[in-house]
Amino acid sequence: MKDLISIIDVKDHVGETVKIGAWVADKSGKGKLQFLQLRDGTAFFQAVVFKPNMIEKFGEEEGTAKFDEIKHLSQETSVYVTGVVKEDSRSKFGYELDVTELEVIGHSHDYPITPKEHGVEFLLDNRHLWLRSKRQMAMMQVRNAIIYASYDFFAKNGFIKFDSPILSGNAAENTTELFETDYFGNPAFLSQSGQLYLEAGAMALGRVFDFGPVFRAEKSKTRRHLTEFWMMDAEYPFVTHDESLDIQEAYVKALIQGVLDNAAYALETLERDTSMLQKYIDTPFKRVSYDDAIDLLQAHENDEDTDYEHVEHGDDFGSPHETWISNYYGVPTFIVNYPASFKAFYMKPVPGNPERVLCADLLAPEGYGEIIGGSERETDYDLLLKKIADFGLDPKDYDWYLELRKFGSVPHAGFGLGLERMVTFVAGTEHIREAIPFPRMINRIQP
């Protein structure tokens, strides 16, 4: 309806009569007053109904009947509400609505998620309704702000959107984590990453990025893992590893700034410490080599406040190691030049040290772990062919990818950012399941 306004816009209509389409999230009151907590997807907002005002407008009989109807509104009833916008310093939102008229659109009966504590599994079983809560709405607004900030960053920095396929005949990362499906009698796999295809795009179009769902058949039940999640991949030619880190740092800072600018109310709802987010924007990220990080972990492994296991050079980090490192530095931290033995086949070796590769993981502080993985790519055809074979992969599956090295290969690099991990970090929430509308985990594929 053209005459409706959104709750988020009521600040521009103080003293005016407005009409809002909303749902009744909660209700309280006594005697001649009723307080309605309304939501419309943009914000939550209190509407106040005063019985004498209803009687004055509609007469004794009709006004009383309308007030009684409002008293008995059930949770999640949809309504059109008309009233005068007033400033309210007691409200976090800062405004309230003095109701003059209310029309019920759709009734709600026996809404399962009542205003009380519920178990996580119950809430996930009712995820289609849990999304209506104040916290979950805020999470989706943070997610939305990050997505829009991503598109804005890439547009301003000369990137072209390049869509990679969801179905693929080969693996980009770990073949043990593939979801396999039948493709007209032949095996196909759900995409783990659009990166290989982005390399083709970069050789044709220059700076490219991709944004879409990816799938990992990891049997992990941690707070950081989903089997289906969204990945923002970027690839760029004529860029070295160190230059790539500069781009990644600028990108992450732009995402945080985008949320501060466009989802401040959501961060307030989530009680996120925005001074920490501002610190991450204002402070240069740390860059630490893998071997220096191992030395640091070994030096502090007997400290009273450490809870990670001993690691040797050549070992991969676990979540406790990542958490400790990022908290030690207090800002997002790049760990660079990991061992080639547990990194992807397409990564370029460190010059003079083939046991290490030109790659980096960006670890978020406050215990959020890796949010970006990136590397400079191998450009030599023969070396890449050997790496594919060494990883036990069939070179025939990568014929097209290898050909990129035969026809004008250039230095190039790129990275992938896990959207849900970034949302979890910026929002300051504990579990990744709240960072996506309908989480897919090892034990959940419904609703």
From Swiss-Prot:
It is an enzyme of class 6 (ligase). It catalyses: tRNA(Asn) + L-asparagine + ATP = L-asparaginyl-tRNA(Asn) + AMP + diphosphate + H(+). Its EC number is 6.1.1.22. Its main location: cytoplasm. One of its GO terms (biological process) is asparaginyl-tRNA aminoacylation. Keywords: Aminoacyl-tRNA synthetase, ATP-binding, Cytoplasm, Ligase, Nucleotide-binding, Protein biosynthesis. It is found in: Cytoplasm. Pfam families: tRNA-synt_2 (PF00152), tRNA_anti-codon (PF01336). Coiled coil: none annotated. GO terms for cellular component: cytoplasm. InterPro entries: Aa-tRNA-synt_II, aa-tRNA-synth_II, aa-tRNA-synth_II/BPL/LPL, Asn-tRNA-ligase, Asp/Asn-tRNA-synth_IIb, NA-bd_OB-fold, NA-bd_OB_tRNA. GO terms for molecular function: asparagine-tRNA ligase activity; ATP binding; catalytic activity, acting on a protein; nucleic acid binding; transferase activity. PANTHER family: ASPARAGINE--TRNA LIGASE, MITOCHONDRIAL-RELATED, ASPARTYL/LYSYL-TRNA SYNTHETASE. Homodimer. Belongs to the class-II aminoacyl-tRNA synthetase family. This is Asparagine--tRNA ligase. It comes from Lactococcus lactis subsp. cremoris (strain MG1363). The lineage of its organism: Bacteria, Bacillati, Bacillota, Bacilli, Lactobacillales.
